[in-house]
């Protein structure tokens, strides 16, 4: 759950002297250095796939990457690969084994994700793919489907700092290892 919910749970538990541990959210970064392009084979494909795992299970998994930090020297080329790969993601009925991204868990979560996309736009994020609800046909029409979304921006934007818990990823660039580590650790979560 969110940090705010975890805080409330721990307060209630403490008031009743109940020992408790909670597993909360985060803004885990995947960091891509320029040498990933030295291996234009299965390794590079796995790097792109690792980033796209942020979309699977609708992005509603605590271990999903939610920020991508890409070295400046490969930023455009690596993102081109990721964007092309993202076009093959199948959205649909979560009971279909071919589906990679289904509907969000609730209308509340759907609305939260959509509001963060608007916040990202207002703060100047560039939508690279997605950025809207997904309109599926038939029985799935009107469901809480969100397009897998990549938003390019800066680490001080809310889409980089606050947990969205949906199929959205913030991407930014860095110059060197020191800057990558500074960006990676520049959240309240410290992940």
Each predicted region: which residue ranges?
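Glycine-rich nucleotide-phosphate-binding loops and adjacent flexible coil segments
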Residues: 167
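Cytochrome P450 core scaffold surrounding the K-helix E-X-X-R motif
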Residues: 157-161
């Amino acid at each position: 759950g969110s940090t705010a919910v975890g805080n409330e749970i721990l307060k209630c538990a403490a008031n009743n002297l109940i020992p408790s541990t909670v597993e909360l959210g985060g803004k885990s970064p995947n960091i891509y250095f320029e040498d990933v392009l030295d291996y234009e084979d299965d390794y590079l494909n796995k790097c792109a796939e690792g980033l796209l795992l942020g979309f699977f299970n609708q992005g509603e998994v605590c271990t999903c990457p939610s920020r991508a930090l890409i070295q400046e020297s490969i930023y455009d080329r690596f993102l081109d690969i990721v964007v092309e790969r993202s076009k093959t993601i199948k959205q649909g009925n979560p009971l279909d084994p071919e589906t990679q991204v289904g509907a969000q868990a609730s209308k509340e979560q759907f609305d939260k994700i959509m509001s963060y996309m608007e916040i990202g736009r207002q703060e100047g994020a560039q939508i690279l793919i997605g950025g809207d609800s997904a309109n599926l046909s038939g029985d799935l029409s009107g469901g809480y489907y969100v397009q897998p979304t990549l938003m390019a921006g800066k680490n001080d934007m809310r889409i980089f700092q606050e947990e969205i818990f949906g199929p959205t990823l913030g991407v930014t660039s860095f110059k060197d290892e020191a800057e990558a580590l500074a960006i990676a650790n520049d959240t309240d979560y410290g992940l």
